[in-house]
Amino acid sequence: GKLDTRVKGIPVVLYNASGFKATDVVTIEVEASRFPKSVAVYNEQGKLVVSQLVSYTDGKVRLLVEATVPANGYAVYDVRLSGEGKEMSAVEAASVENSFYKLTLNENGDITSLFDKRINKELVKAGKAIRLALFTENKSFEWPAWEILKETVDATPISITEDVKVTLCENGALRKTLCVEKRHDDSFFRQYIHLYEGVLAHRIDFTNEVDWQSTNALLKAEFPLNLNNEVATYDLGVGSVQRGNNILTAYEVYAQYWADLTDANGSYGVSIMNDSKYGWDKPDNNTLRLTLLHTPKTKKNYAYQDRQDFGHHTFTYSLVGHVGALDVVQTRENAELLNQRIKAFVVGKHRGELGKSYSLAFSDNRNVLIKALKKAESSDEYVVRVYEAAGKQAQKASIVFADNLVAAVEADGTEKTIGKATFSGNRLEVSVNPNSIKTYKVRFASNKKVQTVAEPLPLVYDKKCFSWNEFKAAANFESGYSYAAELIPAEMNVHGVPFKLETREELNGMACKGNVLKLPADCTYNRLYILAAAASDKDVKGIFRVGKYVQEVIVPSYTGFIGQWGHTGHTEGYLKDAEVAYVGTHRHSGEGDQPYEFTYMFKFAIDLPEKATEVVLPDNKDIVIFAATLTDVAATSVCPASELFRTANKCNRYQTESSTERVNILKQDMVMGYSSYVNEKEKPAFMVDGDENTKWCAIAEMPHYVDFDLGGERSINGWKLLNAAGENHSYVTSSCFLQGKSDKNGEWRTLDYVSGNGKNVLNRTLNKSESVRYLRLLVTQPMQSASGKDVRIYEMEVYE
């Protein structure tokens, strides 16, 4: 709240995370009751800037603003909406132009002409087209996900020509946009071709939305250019490299943000930038191709990868034409801006000592770019990382900060001090060799920490969650696993909120069972923060009650992934919208460390109304609280007004248990056969008795199996195993089959199988519903060790 956000209209704070002053066309969404007739936007100096209304959806107006924001800084803009208008209706079109370019499409929606008006030059090679190029043979039998074969890229790709539709969907002062829709078999493509005016007039953006369902296929963006050079330049992140045309040993090559083809005579060039793709090839002197999607044809090796890249994709690539030689520094800035867009936030109106614009740090030499600016991991210093961008000679620069410095040192990449640094006032003097990186740590003169008014709220701990290296089996947070105590600090500060954890006693977690947290007498705090996680391999829901106020939260699992890519038939893409407070690099089991089995704690905020006396916790024992802190939070309003994090998922989702409780159809009297068991207390029937404290145990020769008669045809959709990690992780079933049949005398057929499992709780969903009367659990590797022969399963469930 230190910026001055007092404006006439809607205050919008713009944030530029790049290390240079950035001017960009920013997309902003603000709430409105209707689509307005007009919009006026003013910068931090009160000057009118160019803006454009785009659309109205779900009570929000989307608009474009040409904005300038200082390096590593903020600017307050004033957005004013007025009147009531109508959105533009899309119209058929085959060309679009701005002050720099005229672009023409053919009947396939491919660009057959791109004319640079500045020097009257056609950029597309005669008889060719800038297009999405589809290779319809993509064999890769040995390493399918990793290797594209030269015979594939040597083939002639086709254009995508089915159901082509081209419309002009935007036609404003800042941006004009063609929307190209087309299809190839089951794959659908929507491409927005954006031409800008003003500061981005030199750049053409291609924003793509693809629903990809093409097998044995490779998709590239193809740029056949009216340029001639055997050599192209490719970005390496820090530095660049020149490469020639495709050869047998180098035909699919990598680059980070951009690649450039400049004519051999140096008169003109084209840079291709992108926000998420890294594979390129150059088949001839005129053409650059960017790899977009790769679904190989497979055989025995990694056969499942024949559906790789299936699903929904969003990505952007951009074209910039430049007169004269390649300016590497300018191209780096252009590409950085594409990848690190200016972010927008709608805020409340208030005074602020920092004014309406603020920059934390910038470089006074355009060849020395600030790559990172962050708090130090283990001190009160700040880390600034710079690199030399031109790649020609050593450079000196001053990094100018918003505050005076009292200390500065040179550091390595791990933030360890390695030498002295020169500074004076608010300037850090740096010297960097070509294409090199330097890291520094600085301490500011006014290095005052913002103190949060806070008080820890005592908890009644009843669960052993953390275990030490010497006693890894002493705790059982979930299924025999525990947090690694040696990683957990006694105190933690999470985004300004302090927490105190119990790290000395055996009990260090509080399971939620509808219990009550009493607030201090005459409590004046207005918010309760908690650290919590779900003692489950799934995310769980819980309801907190404060008087008549009810707040539902989703508490993510303590382990697993925060997000993952989807792979059709195997995994579902997701990204959990949760505030991660703690990450542990491994967890403990009874038999030792489990590296890369990450553990988490999450921060949640519970608002407290005036005169609140208690908080009723959820009635869900899988929600475990580790610490709680009462705070007095100033009323502030900050809402994202632009996309903060781009994901290919159409929506973010938690991996929660189904809202409809699943019923296990297996009963003890359904057991009709088995391989063996140890004793009367460990018979197969105890695996389906609903008691997690009893089990089926067998130690005879393999394979182990249990057969069930369901009493009639049932439609099976999923199943679950609870293994024996509570005894020892080595007892977790590694490989097994779920088999079924309808005829008692028929052959068993496999409904699902698991190989290399390490999870104690195994939840499976079948690819399709299977109708059977008889089921068999066939265990082929009952332990983590391939030589282990003993099976121990506490519960088995099967669902319709």
List each language-model region with its residue ranges.
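C-terminal (or distal) subdomains of carbohydrate-active enzymes
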Residues: 4, 8-456
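Extracellular and analogous surface-interaction loops
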Residues: 15-18, 32, 196-198, 374-376, ...
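Exposed aromatic-hydrophobic patches
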Residues: 63-67, 429-430, 439-441, 517-518, ...
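Extracellular beta-rich ligand/substrate-recognition surface
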Residues: 181-187, 295-297, 362-364, 387, ...
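Short, surface-exposed beta-strand/strand-loop-strand elements in extracellular ectodomains
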Residues: 222-225, 398-403, 540-549, 729-744
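N-terminal/edge-of-domain interface segments
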Residues: 447-660
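Aromatic, loop-rich ligand-recognition surfaces of beta-strand-rich domains
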Residues: 517-525, 533-538, 622-657, 682-750, ...
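Predominantly extracellular/luminal regions of secreted and cell-surface proteins
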Residues: 559-569, 653-689
